[in-house]
Amino acid sequence: MAEALIFDAVRTPRGKGRAKDGALHEVSPVSLAAGTLRALQERNGFAPEAVDDVVLGCVDPVKDQAGDIARTAAIVAGYGDAVPGVQINRFCASGLESVALAASRVKAKDADLIVAGGVEMMSRIGMGGSGMPVLTDPAIAMPNMMIPQGVSADLIASLHGFSRTDVDAYAMESQKRAATAWREGRFTDSVIPVTDRTGVTILDTDEAMRPETDMQSLGALNPAFEGMAKMAGFDAVALQAYPELEGLVHVHHAGNSSQIVDGAAAVLIGSADAGERAGLTPRARILSSVSIGSEPTIMLTGPVEATRRALAKAGLSVDDIELWELNEAFASVVLYFLQEIGVSHDRINVNGGAIAMGHPLGATGAMILGTLLDEMERADRKTGVATLCAASGQAIATVIERV
């Protein structure tokens, strides 16, 4: 079986996911995705026609994101008529799932060189814009005990004793780490500025960061999911699934949850032979990738099991992994992972995460993989894991090793 190598990874800066003041709102999703594809080609000099496929994650593929955005982006990026493209959706895990699918095809020798990644323009198409019957159809949601992710995050906090202070302290640290990373230029190599048609830069840094965040400002925010959970009966569903609880403690709000943003990312994956033919230098190999399903009410704890399986598949233990990236969907998700996996906080999300910089749903998985690889090189670390939870109880984890 062939190795699947990572040759490069790029991402756009994340723009605020709001129509009124998001810097990227006027950029089309196709253009944003095409920009990452074009950057990969220009940085590495491979012939576009050498690419066997383009695989992009997109969670809400409707309106401006509809019509197989991967194929359209490949055409717009100048990859030529012969390069196909496919859009996939595993909710928030979509960007990393695209990488896993690309790696599987390379390992199976079904393809030699693939661009994988994702795109999501949340300022144009809001979360759930493509419809989500697991939440909106009571005939599906109630019998299967489906609840919104924010309520699931509060359920995790309630079950495991994470207080409002705990989740706010984690959020504040994410903001501090992200601000430090940007100040020290840790994202410079992989973040490509977004420009307009005249070449003027529209955005070159993550727009949604709030480096001034402190415990006082976080403490002033009201819980975001309490009213909705009680009014719509989601608290009752959670307590039916977890009767050991007397009630839910709602601790999550806008300041300790992932931010709604626009963004795109792309990763160049291929075989050693393809790399040699194209003059590419490999940066890492993909050792394993595992996607799982887990209990859908609590929903967001899946990264623990996905990570354990991915490590077992790679023949490694937790102690063998030097750096970790876990998508900060909500603060309790990371606190639970730290508790169950036994990773110290100084080895995970060392440059901040989605609480500080945002979570462009279909792109985040590819983004955090690139962030992980950049930090592994900067800090001279050998092994890393990228992992995300996803809606309806899914999760993915990928293990990489520098070469």
Task: Identify what each model region corresponds to.
Residues M1-G17:
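N-terminal amphipathic/basic leader segments beginning at the initiator methionine
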Residues V10-P13, H25-G35, R43, A169-A272, ...:
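N-terminal extracellular/periplasmic Venus flytrap/periplasmic-binding protein-like
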Residues V27, C58-D112, M132, N144-D154, ...:
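Conserved catalytic cysteine-centered active-site region
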Residues I88-V119, A157-F187, A266-D273, P360-R381, ...:
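Active-site-proximal alpha-helical scaffold in enzymes
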Residues D154, S190, L287-A356:
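Active-site pocket-lining segment
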